[in-house]
Amino acid sequence: MTAVTAAQRSVPAPFLSKTYQLVDDHSTDDVVSWNEEGTAFVVWKTAEFAKDLLPQYFKHNNFSSFIRQLNTYGFRKTVPDKWEFANDYFRRGGEDLLTDIRRRKSVIASTAGKCVVVGSPSESNSGGGDDHGSSSTSSPGSSKNPGSVENMVADLSGENEKLKRENNNLSSELAAAKKQRDELVTFLTGHLKVRPEQIDKMIKGGKFKPVESDEESECEGCDGGGGAEEGVGEGLKLFGVWLKGERKKRDRDEKNYVVSGSRMTEIKNVDFHAPLWKSSKVCN
């Protein structure tokens, strides 16, 4: 049993070995690298780190899970406003020191108020399951530790990407709407002879006089014959505006009615003022 324990201690946990290789790779120093002293490593670009580097070494791309896994091996955040992590046995050029890093024992409180140790010492040194998400290897209370901040950062990054996609969609829809508007203006000015100022009023919701064709304008001075009135339709209405003027029959009818009414009044007046001696009736 002692020989097995010694053999396990001579080999670092897979998570530690992969993390060391990830940090020590100079081709990705713009994303993650050692600090100037070589006593800690810094993640400079969290989004690229999670998207591009984590899947190459681990079975996930969750930055928060990676942080929680560091916590289980005793790493600590050294700078509040920077993703810089350190461990006494994790330093540049000291890969042989990784065997001295021990994994913490997960302790949870039972319903009876007693503490129960999860996992044996041999399991803590073997590093089994390091490649999986740390939600299965860390304690339930770890979300209340600095890992909760990493969760928030990951959520905000995802929300930011979602907003960018929505912004691009809205920009495309706006460009399509502007194109349709330009096509409509071209149609109105080219085919229906609508003046630009009328289009402006139409867009702004204003009111203006209907647009009449040349034939209808000429018929305005014609006599109110029935043939001219029969050929008039209701016209075309667009956005609540008549583009083709409707013949106003009612005005002519009212005009004719006034003329007829005056004639009837004259006749009645003549009858009323007729002399009594011209009456055909004779009183006996």
From Swiss-Prot:
Biased composition (Low complexity): 134-148
Short motif Nuclear localization signal, span: 247-252
Pfam families per record: HSF_DNA-bind
Top-level division of the source organism's lineage: Eukaryota
GO terms for biological process, alphabetical: negative regulation of DNA-templated transcription; response to heat
GO molecular function: DNA-binding transcription factor activity; sequence-specific DNA binding
Post-translational modification, as annotated: Exhibits temperature-dependent phosphorylation.
Compartment list: Nucleus
Gene3D superfamilies to which the protein is assigned, alphabetical: Winged helix-like DNA-binding domain superfamily/Winged helix DNA-binding domain (1.10.10.10)
Up-regulation conditions: By heat stress.
SUPFAM superfamilies: Winged helix' DNA-binding domain
UniProt DNA-binding region: 12-106
Protein task: Transcriptional regulator that specifically binds DNA sequence 5'-AGAAnnTTCT-3' known as heat shock promoter elements (HSE).
Assembly: Homotrimer.
PANTHER family named in the record: HEAT SHOCK TRANSCRIPTION FACTOR, HEAT STRESS TRANSCRIPTION FACTOR B-1
Family, similarity comment: Belongs to the HSF family. Class B subfamily.
Record's protein name: Heat stress transcription factor B-1
Gene: HSFB1
